[in-house]
Design a protein with these regions (language model features):
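Switch/communication elements of ASCE P-loop NTPase nucleotide-binding domains
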Residues: 16-157
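ABC-family P-loop ATPase nucleotide-binding domains
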Residues: 1-13, 24
């Protein structure tokens, strides 16, 4: 993000290089979310040993900004912030999966866990499945729907 966040007269603003200052209520949801992260970091609220819970960070966000959010969350984790997110987004899930599989190496390797909550068909109980490897999660509604739409597309083009 090519800007900075500041507070003036009890209001938050985003200052964008070459574009001016914008009251936070007037910027897009994606920039507002990124700005909030920046402000929490600069104010010291998100530091080593802090915990961040974020439900569906992709909600109301331009898909082009999702990688910036996932990159920021990974950097926060590398700084020592424990990050928990929930998502229904293929893009968010795959961004973390690609990082975990191909980039999460070395002495600062993060302990990334993928989890899926689902209802057991046999007894109706809520269950949790977790793994360090996303491909080992068998109850993955995101991938199930991705596969279903892919199969539908294949049927339509044949």
């Amino acid at each position: 993000m090519n800007g900075s966040v500041f507070q003036k007269d009890n209001k938050f603003y985003l200052k964008v290089k070459g574009s001016g200052e914008f009251e936070m209520g007037l910027v897009s949801e994606g920039y507002r979310k990124l700005s909030t992260l920046i402000y929490l970091i600069l104010s010291g609220s998100l530091n080593k040993n802090a915990i961040l819970f974020w439900d569906e960070p992709e909600t109301n966000m331009n898909p082009k900004l999702i990688s910036h959010v996932t990159d920021a969350l990974i950097k926060l984790s590398q700084m020592g912030v424990q990050v928990f997110i929930s998502t229904h987004s293929y893009f968010v899930q795959q961004s973390f999966n690609l990082f975990a599989e191909y980039q999460n190496k070395g002495k600062n390797k993060l302990d990334i866990q993928f989890m899926s909550l689902y209802k057991d068909i046999e007894n109706g109980k809520l269950k949790c499945e977790k793994s360090k490897d996303l491909s080992e999660i068998s109850h993955n509604a995101i991938m199930e729907e991705f596969d279903a739409i892919y199969d539908k597309e294949q049927e339509l083009i044949e």
